[in-house]
């Protein structure tokens, strides 16, 4: 079951943490960069859920890895544009690094 996957749970928890942060973006960016960040996080969750049920997991896990890298870049851009604080960026980076380690471990099982 997908809820049993720690990496899925951590990504879901990241989305719960992220939502109020994105809602504080400037109004002009909330529905541009903010929405893109939330959508990318949801894409990552979707890729993990799909990989969990598919027989051929490798391609979906690689897709999840790319989505994670894109998400890291979008969070960094948000920091550089000062939409998130250094502290929020640090929390996000820590959470994304943990997700990345868990995802890499999962990928190693199927490569």
Enumerate the predicted regions with their spans.
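Amphipathic alpha-helical assembly/interaction segments
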Residues: 1-111
């Amino acid at each position: 079951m997908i809820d049993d996957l720690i990496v899925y749970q951590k990504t879901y928890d990241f989305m719960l943490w992220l939502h109020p942060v994105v809602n504080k973006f400037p109004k002009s960016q909330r529905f541009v960069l903010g929405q893109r960040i939330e959508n990318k996080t949801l894409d990552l969750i979707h890729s993990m859920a799909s990989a969990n049920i598919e027989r051929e997991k490798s391609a979906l896990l690689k897709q999840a890895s790319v989505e994670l890298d894109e998400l890291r870049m979008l969070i960094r851009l948000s920091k550089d544009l000062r939409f998130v604080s250094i502290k929020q960026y640090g929390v996000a980076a820590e959470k994304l690094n943990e997700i990345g380690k868990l995802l890499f471990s999962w990928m190693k099982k199927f490569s």
